[in-house]
From Swiss-Prot:
This is Peroxisomal acyl-coenzyme A oxidase 1. Keywords: FAD, Fatty acid metabolism, Flavoprotein, Lipid metabolism, Oxidoreductase, Peroxisome. PANTHER family: ELECTRON TRANSPORT OXIDOREDUCTASE, PEROXISOMAL ACYL-COENZYME A OXIDASE 1. It catalyses: a 2,3-saturated acyl-CoA + O2 = a (2E)-enoyl-CoA + H2O2. It holds the Pfam family Acyl-CoA_ox_N. The active site is at E437. Belongs to the acyl-CoA oxidase family. It comes from Dictyostelium discoideum.
Amino acid sequence: MYCPKAYENEKKNEDLEFERSQSTFSVSELNFILNNNDHNIINIKNEIKKFIDNDEIISKPQEIHFLSREEQYKRALYVSSKLIEIKKRFGEIGRDQYYQSLFEEIPFVINDIVFACAFKSLASDEQMNRLYSKFENYQYFGSYSQTEIGHGSNVQGIETTCTFIKETGEFELNSPNLTSTKFWIGGLGKLATHTIVFAQLLIPSSIDGKLKNYGPHPFILQVRSLDDHSPLPGVTVGDIGPKLGFNSIDNGFLRLDHVRIPRENMLSRFFRVNEQGEYEKPKHPKLIYAGMVGVRSSMIENSFVSLSRAVTIAIRYSTIRKQFKSNRLDKQEKKIIEYSNQMNRIIPYLAQTFAYFFTGKRFSIEFDQMMKAVKHNQDTTLLSELHANSSGLKSLMTQSTSDGIESCRLSCGGHGYSQFSGLPYLWSNYVHMSSAEGESNLLPQQTTKYLLTILRKVLSGGGGSSDTTTADDDNKPIGKSVKYINDEFQSSFENINQFIQEKGLNSIIHPDSLLQLFKHRSFILIKSIAESIQEQMSNGNKDIPQIWSDLNVEINHCSKAHCQLYVIQSFYDQILLLSSNSSSCSSSITTVLIQLLQTYSIWIINSNLVDFLQDQYVELSQIDFLKKSLINFYKLLRPNLVPLVDSFDLCNTTLGSALGSYNGDVYSTLYKWASTQPFNKNSLPLGFNETIKPLINSKL
């Protein structure tokens, strides 16, 4: 655990120290688990935190709030430049830990995460060998140009074109109209030298010469000179302007005027155009979007990072802040964390933070397994399931993380509105994730479409399961994350009581019982949509797109239910794995993790009661019991709240918060930052003598 000498010399808040003394588990042991049981990662993290705390500029995150857009970007470039030293010392692990330890986002993250995920997924081995080291060593800077000013989530509808010129063996990229302008492209506004452009692939027919559209494909394009960084001929590029947040990142626009690139610039791991202009298609149509799935995998994994910061600030502040006495005899006011409505604002999101950590870990492993199978054997068995889950999980986890940060901000009352709390900046920098790489209100449709495919397969008798998933081949077994659809179809249990009795469980709040409730709920929602579609068609409505559109709300909710099940299953599986190895995880930790799992599950049930009651699988009395149990779990977790957020081991510079510092010096820090801000340097504001003073001296 990281504890710099500066923290040791600070006065410790007695309330926080008392909270830490109440812990029922080892904080350092849980921290070890959160770092993949790897001492090397912890040591690297500690060195990076020390590096950050010792830097005169990076260690003062509160100063960001007083900078202009240009000054913010200049600061971000300075912080980015320090990454070179980190990478030299610690390699790629150090790079990732540096990003996670910073208060602000920096431009290099686009090259290292977004571009790198896409390039490594889509580039051939030859292209990787020829180009990737240039981006890795920051000789080139990459970006990912898919979204257009007129098209976002509808990737098939993008308007940028890439025409194969057979006479020269080149491609020609073009922006045919205003709405084809690439827009919102991270890192492109000022920094990127190259970008991956998604464009409609047009190839002349060998028979009549007419252009045939093969759909969106990725191409690597140099946009700026390596000598003076100016835009290359035919390239119009710039920054899109101020945003709600994320302003240290240069989101850009791009227009192309018949720009020629070599045929070899088509990213061709899965598809290519040969010298004769013949298109060699991918084994699976969704392989074109492998890069996008890679970026989503990173977003899914990193939702934990932002949410852990928010709950750390909210919980520490809530144990220090005191308001109202329980009765006149009390000497002190009550900690606001003691109030049940405050617990309800924060504790579910603390539980969600841990759930999302283990979910991100699982999905990252599954993505790596899928890409390995595709690259080595052209095996697309895992792709459909992974693509569907990435769509729904990205939607669920980014939106609920945004909601969690906002709930934590609100839990801090008026001080949560101050930028000095660290929460408004955290939220405004994160909230764009709901729209990035697929709008979160549209992506769930891809998930539900896949779930309906699995249901149709099960109903037709093809429900044999394995640890793999079906792609477009009906002979392949269904996958692990959707196996419950077949299980529920085959199940003889009419209600949860029969399941509890059969499994020999002691209560509906047992994790196995809760997991079963989520499996049944998801199955019922999938089946309900299938029945609604069938009913419409039986009544003569053959307009499938319109039926689908009319059911969009239910479709999105169905995806959410499936993904919440995925999260709970991931969390529970990891707890079982940890508990099976007593040498690496003590029973005290598995106990508190199970309490977090139960809290998260019951909280979701309470928020979606109609789903769980609709077919009488659960009794009303059991729902009432679950509602009361939630408050009991809050009380069980109460002594461990501060220790749980301490296990994230977030340093003060990372949080950038007067409310959430490790030693709890809230009020003096808040006053110090307020009183020393630049706006208070002069007693008279600019313009006072010209505008206000004449009014004071006038005789109106």
